[in-house]
Amino acid sequence: MIEEEVLKIIKPTEEDKKGIEKVLEIIRERLNKLDFEVEGSFRKGTWLRQDTDIDVFVFYPKDVGKEYLERNALNDIINRIKDLDYTLAYAEHPYVIVNINNVEVDIVPALRVESGDKAITAVDRTPFHTKYVTSHLDERGKDEVRLLKRFMKGIGVYGAELKVQGFSGYATELLIIYYGNFRKVLEEASKWKHPIKIELTKPMKIFSEPLIIPDPVDPKRNVTAAVSLKNIATFSIAAKYYLKNPSIEFFFPSKKVEEKVKGDVLILRLNLDEKSSEDIVWGQIKRSVNKIERALKQYGFRVIDVQAWGDTNNITIAVQLESKNIGQYYLNIGPQYYSQTIEDFIQKNDNIWVGEDGRLYSIKERKEYDAETIAKKNIVLKVKYNIESYWLQNTEDQQIMKFLRKTPTWLK
Amino acid sequence: MIEEEVLKIIKPTEEDKKGIEKVLEIIRERLNKLDFEVEGSFRKGTWLRQDTDIDVFVFYPKDVGKEYLERNALNDIINRIKDLDYTLAYAEHPYVIVNINNVEVDIVPALRVESGDKAITAVDRTPFHTKYVTSHLDERGKDEVRLLKRFMKGIGVYGAELKVQGFSGYATELLIIYYGNFRKVLEEASKWKHPIKIELTKPMKIFSEPLIIPDPVDPKRNVTAAVSLKNIATFSIAAKYYLKNPSIEFFFPSKKVEEKVKGDVLILRLNLDEKSSEDIVWGQIKRSVNKIERALKQYGFRVIDVQAWGDTNNITIAVQLESKNIGQYYLNIGPQYYSQTIEDFIQKNDNIWVGEDGRLYSIKERKEYDAETIAKKNIVLKVKYNIESYWLQNTEDQQIMKFLRKTPTWLK
């Protein structure tokens, strides 16, 4: 069975666990006397081997407020670990990342609230998620979560970050709790048609997103609010195809791909000067991708596909057009001969004629007909960056090959 | 006054009239004892100087039928003029063209019917048209018709033949009879919005054409049924512009035009082997122009304009595209992820991906992406022809220059 094979790879051993416990011992000592708890997939037992961060939350009374967390609490934590290898990171508010023996530990200050629906910052809900999941998943259930996570990683729909807009770990856990096991989740997902409602609890709000999983610990929140329709659709199709023809390729796509350049492909290589938060950079990259596509279409190009990939500093945007030569001039459709506006049209236009339909037509010059210029103009990054751009001739780059091939290897 | 100047040029002198009368004397002798009459603009006194054919109709009792006209009557006429310079021509049925001193005389066999609405062939109505016009137009009215004819010739909307799809001589006469004079026709035409109804008599049928002038001698027929909307619109616009700013340019467009090539312009030069009737050839040319435009659009080209010009043997079709490079591949939009048809789509397509909207997309190869091939394939001529085609670089050809400029010189 494929799934057993996969579990052998992804299920942590006792040794893996001990390694992480050893790291945690160091952190526990440092946070002595603080109100802290281990959260996240390690605590819930749904983590993947060699593929996890450890989340340690430090709680403060809710009355201290957000600003206390961001200054005093953070400073206290930093003082306790400053001799270790650490960096500062930002989500809704700042937290500390400590690296010990190549294990990443996120130390997150949070407010202690009475229940999930009383959360003041997004992270305050986390201990309630932990409680909900640990009390609803048995040992087999944890492995089912692991399979689902790895499957979603394999097909590229795992990760709540803006860059992915995929499923969070918590979402995979809720799916397993709701449907029972990995196979059952796939069976149901293969039949999805949005809006999809998965109600472990009654929603306390009307949600408009395509996939709706009201949070059992805070039912006015949709756990999968940020999952894109593209990822929902991809997951549904992958589920259908996996059930028909299970293969390790879904979990660990490995095939090297090759494809020729079809149409005209513009490659934009961006190099960001400053280090910014991933979600901030990718928010801007996603906006840029949309703007580039919209602008090119507006200028008359037929766009096949625009995609972006990369990390937080080196980003590639690929723009695929049916043709980069759309011509300098375009047909301009004017008013009917009996319209009040014909004199204005005739005055403002050149190359005017009357069509068989009684309308006036003219030829107009495009304001811009160089796709490269249009694409570059529509990159909206708030940090400084260098850009290198070229029309693709041929390539060895596997990422570009994937962009050209498009079809996922697990599909065909 | 412009119009007086124009009349000086177009109004025949006594000498012109005598010249034609001399030609007619020869024809009258030849048709001795037949029931013949002079019809057409010469008879009606609405002909233009150095710009007329003479129509002579030979009438037979209506009981002899169409076939008698086409054989016996025609042969009799030919026998009488066979020593002169003559050719055979075809409209609804055959007639004889005799050339005497560079004056063209059309000798047309027709059936003698009691009234216009009893016409068996289209030409049987003609003597009733002649009677109607001569009894409704005075001398000044005839000059007004001449002005209107010359104006329509100048702007290219005169001529009932399929090649032009413009106004017939009879239509111009009815317009003057209805509105009173040339200026009044223009004033009204400048305000036209189709459907336009000009009722010298109550229509005996519901007409669907944009311009409706029920024939006073046969009210179930629309005199302007064959006038294209393009010509109606052109006439309306020209009327409006002439009234604002009268100029000889409307009557005798003379300006040499120049224009650069905008977009990609394909020139197709057709040379027809056989001599065919103009209306038959131009029916096929018009169909070809439409087919070329439709096919190019269907294959994904953005068509600016397709036009044809020439005579009955040498015809030019010009095809203007925004760009001839539309690329070998195109974006193919597939079904939503939840559709029954996705498996079929995935099986039949390559380069498949899921879009942000949850749809499947793929890249497809165009069956044809060479505009020249598509244009040539869509020429539907039933006679043999040679074709020469090329992408326009630059030209001295005034017809091509006019095609490139488009804007009529009288407009701007």
Curated annotation (Swiss-Prot), chains A, B:
What's its EC?
A: 2.7.7.72
Metal-binding: is it a keyword of this entry?
A: yes
Biological process GO annotation list? Answer: RNA repair; tRNA 3'-terminal CCA addition
InterPro entries recorded for this chain? CAA_C, CCA-adding_arc, CCA_tRNA_nucleotrans_2, NT_2-5OAS_ClassI-CCAase, NT_sf, NuclTrfase_I-like_C, Polymerase_NTP_transf_dom, tRNA_NucTransf2
At which positions is Mg(2+) bound?
Answer: D53, D55, D106
Cofactor(s) essential for the protein: Mg(2+)
Q: How does it assemble?
A: Homodimer.
Can you say what this protein is called?
Answer: CCA-adding enzyme
**What species is this protein from?**
Saccharolobus islandicus (strain M.16.4 / Kamchatka #3) (Sulfolobus islandicus)
Which lineage is the organism of this entry classified under, starting from the top rank? Archaea, Thermoproteota, Thermoprotei, Sulfolobales, Sulfolobaceae
What is the gene name? cca
